[in-house]
Amino acid sequence: MAYSAELDIRVTDTSLRDGSHHKRHQFTATEVRDIVAALDGAGVPVIEVTHGDGLGGSSFNYGFSKTPEQELVTIAAQTAKQAKIAVLMLPGVGVKEDIKVSQDNGASICRIATHCTEADVSIQHFGLARELGLETVGFLMMSHTQPPEVLAKQARIMADAGCQCVYIVDSAGALVLEQVSDRVAAVVAELGDDAQVGFHGHENLDLAVANSIYAIRAGATQIDGSARRFGAGAGNTPVEALVGVCDKLGIRTGIDFFAIADAAEDVVRPAMPQECLLDRQALMMGYAGVYSSFLKHAERQAERYGVSAAEMLVRAGRRKLVGGQEDQLIDIALELQREQQTATV
């Protein structure tokens, strides 16, 4: 199964959304303009632009944006000559009006994300997006926490609501090879021709490219990545590496390998505060199955309370915390601090 007559898969670059976590939501208008121009010039067909936690995410809980996200969406849409601009929406973080405003500002794809057992909360949002004429994509976040058959049922809910492509989303970078292909295959079998299937990976176990290939071989036709891994945790599937691997395997992406390598090195990297690294904390997230955007929050609270960020993330995994529960990291930090104080008495 191919995405289209011209492409075997369609790649979405999430540098300007997932990368917002790594940058603590401090993108400038100039950075967005330059990155969109470079990605568009390399042939990237879809570029996602929003606050890291989606439309309406600029808040005390998630972190405030340096530049209003709708301004960035507008700039991206005005800059791109061929690429479509996508926005991410988490029901409960953003509201339906945000979808309308995004479309007015030039977005043409609405990606709606829920926890992988809560697809039903997306029904009205998919309905609105389709009414507006937007292309729709659904995200089943934290897909490592549920078996294939559960994900297939949740994907059916999204597809019946109007979702045109359902993604298996490895939010924690915790899935390993066949765990990806088994989940993708189950959703492909459930949806048939009703909707496409996609995969969104993270590098917390250093498997994002390999996992993406397993997803493609299982029937996924839309794949996410970020140039230079620019994303939460250890980062996303590096688009430039994914394109190179796909070229070698004869998988058509429509992206120029040399141009995307240049864009990653010369344009995206200068906008990053530092490289996305597979360090101890990121590794713990993949191992313990922790939502990748928790990394910066955990590092900040660990410094504040004088405790181990790695241990905080392991405990977050034990508690099965999901996106939106970042505030519980403070409880974990205080718990560790009390244990340290007790141990020294």
From Swiss-Prot:
Residues 9-261 form the Pyruvate carboxyltransferase domain. The keyword Cell inner membrane does not apply. It comes from the Bacteria. It is an enzyme of class 4 (lyase). Disulfide bonds: none annotated. Keywords: Aromatic hydrocarbons catabolism, Lyase, Manganese, Metal-binding. It catalyses: (S)-4-hydroxy-2-oxopentanoate = acetaldehyde + pyruvate. One of its GO terms (molecular function) is manganese ion binding. Gene3D superfamilies: 1.10.8.60, Aldolase class I. Signal peptide: none annotated. Belongs to the 4-hydroxy-2-oxovalerate aldolase family. This is 4-hydroxy-2-oxovalerate aldolase 1. It comes from Nocardia farcinica (strain IFM 10152). The lineage of its organism: Bacteria, Bacillati, Actinomycetota, Actinomycetes, Mycobacteriales.
